[in-house]
């Protein structure tokens, strides 16, 4: 039976190292002797229910660890369920009861170290690069045991589309990229090309989809790179990724420092592998794949003609003639000049050494977690190519388990975890609901959560001359996952700072030892560092690149990948934190904080769409963006009465509320750049919770409360018997095209909305 282990309990290794005793680390382990017959039956039922209903909802409810935690804590829901019949007659007691039920359930899910574990997967291209890397290096069976492979195959079966392909993410129609690499993944873990199973001939259907759509030469660049290192594609059919790029000076329009942090991290490993033209040693399976993936004989393919191919199903960012001409020029210079004698000895070898120096620096600085599962695979493979027995590679191997997550739908690979983000957003609604009569359960939850925040803050900048190594300050920030990962993010920092400021106001006998005030100041320094001239704030690093550089993006299936950008959600979160900070510490960098807030408000107001919404970047999409925008404006003192953008935002939500009283936004909004409801205008619990929060913050309860009551009725009536809420559509996103699953959102935004709603009822009802 699978068990989730937390922190130092998650196992140790001589090649692991940590900054805070592994606080926030979460590792799945298989124990053949664990689990009673009843527990095992419950797990199988959860798996069966997902498989039977996967055509209805594509994402798992993340039940396995929740079942484990609830059993271990002896959870029992004793508070009776509330059912609302007439929205206009909701009583304070009804809303409060629903909130208490949800809190009782949710607090039982907190880990001992103070964070809330959760799945953070969804993209269908996270698994295969790691599997391919481990296969090439000969460590597949060490990392992916028989039990791992059973769950991996289960996941692939569950998320294969009816046409035989896999989508970019679990809700997407099939694309070439994910179908090709997942087909390869299944073949590597032992599924035969014509294997018959309960789902039909999975590989047969996938191969048919690939061949019917032109073959694997139509996979985008990242897929071509995965295939090239495996030896089932030729490097000459890839757009160039020369390691000499890292020699470009900072005065050049594009250089290592101007790249978006994720593209830099991926390109760093790929440029080394490309520069070496590394290809795995052929195996019988590799030779079979060469014949299985293409409609023509492998030896007859003209790779030069495949370089710019990309299946129409994959194409989100089409290349222009100018872009194709640019990459052709880079290829000629890189391969016809730099890769030939004497330049291959004088320049190429020096570039490869520089690339590995950069790569090792980045890996050490983030404890070999890297920036995500895709760069992780390329970094790890590059280290193995450099030295198969080296310490760098062994340190990478020790961190692979940090990416593995087990759900009722099988084994998936995460980005690298959302521990901090999920935790700090959970603490927000708990802190918003703090009253004089806080019970022991809530107090204990808050204290543990505060302790987690204190231990998770990044307290140092990257080592040595970090600017030369394309790193920026990190001291004072909080990461998306855990401290060891080492990449602080602006919104994670802002939301954590706001929580710590609220804890700072509480008596020590309630919350224990408080955070050093200097660390609060460090967080403010980090946020101020990231604001751009336009008033917006970026996510990881200052926005140094020119927007026209996006025209030369080599990545076909996502948008905005070349340079760092400002984000409305991050800006809203930062305003919330800094307005609270200015109230408690009005003299610290007073003018800079005031200027940040003023410019940030203008940035948010300038970004508002014609319909009154804001386009979100990290969630689906216009409701999500509107929530963070309005939250920032309200924190800065704006109201429905003195702020036209807030009035327009409220009108947008009232206009899009469905007949049931809820909201449900489709991820297609992200692609169409226009609000798009779910098919049939059905309700989604996350969208409804977020919209309900905006209406309350916008003062709708004081003007016409019925739309708010109708939305609250939806949230209350959707609550399950145990206090949980139903898992529906995926509501996280990145790069405007890739869904990222946050199963905890169904709890966070439902309970946060109910918290604000009960407070509004208490104020208004006699």
From Swiss-Prot:
One function term, GO molecular function aspect: arabidiol synthase activity
A GO-annotated cellular component: lipid droplet
SUPFAM superfamilies the UniProt entry points to: Terpenoid cyclases/Protein prenyltransferases
Single biological process term from Gene Ontology: triterpenoid biosynthetic process
Active-site residues from the entry: 491 (proton donor)
Keywords: Lyase, Repeat
EC number assigned by the record: 4.2.1.124
InterPro entries: SQ_cyclase_C (IPR032696), SQ_cyclase_N (IPR032697), Squalene_cyclase (IPR018333), Terpene_synthase_CS (IPR002365), Terpenoid_cyclase/PrenylTrfase (IPR008930)
The PFTB repeat ranges on this chain: 149-190, 520-561, 597-637, 646-687
Catalytic activity as recorded in UniProt: arabidiol = (S)-2,3-epoxysqualene + H2O
Source organism, top-level taxon: Eukaryota
Coiled coil, from the record: none
NCBIfam families with a match to the protein in the record: squalene_cyclas
Similarity-based family: Belongs to the terpene cyclase/mutase family.
Function statement: Converts oxidosqualene to arabidiol. Minor production of arabidiol 20,21-epoxide.
Alphabetical list of PANTHER family matching this protein: ARABIDIOL SYNTHASE-RELATED, TERPENE CYCLASE/MUTASE FAMILY MEMBER
Full protein name: Arabidiol synthase
Name of the gene this protein is made from: PEN1
């Amino acid at each position: 039976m699978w068990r989730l282990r937390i922190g130092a309990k998650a196992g140790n290794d001589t090649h692991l190292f940590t900054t805070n005793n592994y606080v926030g680390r979460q590792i799945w382990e298989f124990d053949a002797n664990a689990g009673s017959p009843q527990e095992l039956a419950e797990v199988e039922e959860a798996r069966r229910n997902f498989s039977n209903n996967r055509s209805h909802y594509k994402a798992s409810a993340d039940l396995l660890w929740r079942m484990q935690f609830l059993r271990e804590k002896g959870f029992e829901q004793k508070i009776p369920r509330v059912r609302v019949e007439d929205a206009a007659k909701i009583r304070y007691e009804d809303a409060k009861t629903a909130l208490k039920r949800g809190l009782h359930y949710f607090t039982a899910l907190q880990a001992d170290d103070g964070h809330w574990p959760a799945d953070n997967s969804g993209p269908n291209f996270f698994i295969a690069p790691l599997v391919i890397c481990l296969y090439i290096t000969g460590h597949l069976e060490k990392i992916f045991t028989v039990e791992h492979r059973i769950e991996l195959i289960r996941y692939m079966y569950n998320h294969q589309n009816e046409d035989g392909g896999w989508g970019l993410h679990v809700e997407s129609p099939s694309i070439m990229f994910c179908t090709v690499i997942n087909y390869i993944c299944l073949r590597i873990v032992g599924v035969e090309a014509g294997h018959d199973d309960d789902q039909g001939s999975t590989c047969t259907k996938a191969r048919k989809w690939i061949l019917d759509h032109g073959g694997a030469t139509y996979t985008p660049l990242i897929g071509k790179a995965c295939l090239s290192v495996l030896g089932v594609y030729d490097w000459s059919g890839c757009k160039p990724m020369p390691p000499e790029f890292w020699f470009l000076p900072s005065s050049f329009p594009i250089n290592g420092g101007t790249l978006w942090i994720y593209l830099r991290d991926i390109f760093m490993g790929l440029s080394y592998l490309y520069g070496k033209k590394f290809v795995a040693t052929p195996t019988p399976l590799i030779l079979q794949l060469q014949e299985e993936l293409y409609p023509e004989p492998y030896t007859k393919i003209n790779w030069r003609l495949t370089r710019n191919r990309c299946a129409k199903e994959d194409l989100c960012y089409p290349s222009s003639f100018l872009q194709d001409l640019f990459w052709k020029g880079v290829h000629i210079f890189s391969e016809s000049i730099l890769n030939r004698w004497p330049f291959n000895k004088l320049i190429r070898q020096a570039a490869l050494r520089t690339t590995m120096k950069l790569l090792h620096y980045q890996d050490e600085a983030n404890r070999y977690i890297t920036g995500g599962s895709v760069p992780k695979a390329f970094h790890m493979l590059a280290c193995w190519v450099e030295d198969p027995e080296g310490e760098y590679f062994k340190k990478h191997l020790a961190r692979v388990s940090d990416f593995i997550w087990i759900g009722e739908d099988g084994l998936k690979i995460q980005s690298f975890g959302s521990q901090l983000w999920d935790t700090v957003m959970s603490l927000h609604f708990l802190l918003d609901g703090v009253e004089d009569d806080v019970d022991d359960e809530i107090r204990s939850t808050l204290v543990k959560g505060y302790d987690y925040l204190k231990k998770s803050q990044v307290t140092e900048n990257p080592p040595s001359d970090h600017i030369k190594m394309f790193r920026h300050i990190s001291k004072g920030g909080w990461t998306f996952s855990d401290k060891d990962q080492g990449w602080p993010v602006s919104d994670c920092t802002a939301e954590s700072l706001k929580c710590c400021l609220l804890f700072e106001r509480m008596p020590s006998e309630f919350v224990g030892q408080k955070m050093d005030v200097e660390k609060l100041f460090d967080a403010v320094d980090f946020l101020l560092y990231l604001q751009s001239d336009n008033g917006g704030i970026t996510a990881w690093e200052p926005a140094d690149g020119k927007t026209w550089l996006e025209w030369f993006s080599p990545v076909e299936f996502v948008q905005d990948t070349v340079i760092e950008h400002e984000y409305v959600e991050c800006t809203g979160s930062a305003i919330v934190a800094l307005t609270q900070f200015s109230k408690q510490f009005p003299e610290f960098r007073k003018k800079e904080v005031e200027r940040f807030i003023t410019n940030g408000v203008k940035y948010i107001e300038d970004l508002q769409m014609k319909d009154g919404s804001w386009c979100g970047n990290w969630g689906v999409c216009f409701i999500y963006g509107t929530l963070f925008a309005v939250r920032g404006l309200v924190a800065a003192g704006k109201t429905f009465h003195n702020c036209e953008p807030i009035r327009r935002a409220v009108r947008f939500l009232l206009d899009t509320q469905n007949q049931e009283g809820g909201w449900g936004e489709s991820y297609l909004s992200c692609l169409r750049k226009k609000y798009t409801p779910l098919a049939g205008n059905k309700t989604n619990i996350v969208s409804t919770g977020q919209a309900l929060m905006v209406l309350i913050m916008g003062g709708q309860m004081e003007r016409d409360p019925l739309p708010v009551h109708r939305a609250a009725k939806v949230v209350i009536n959707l609550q399950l018997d145990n206090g949980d809420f139903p898992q529906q559509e995926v509501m996280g996103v990145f790069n405007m095209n890739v869904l990222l699953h946050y199963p905890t959102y169904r709890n966070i935004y439902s309970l946060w909305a109910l918290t604000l709603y009960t407070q509004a009822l208490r104020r208004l009802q006699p």
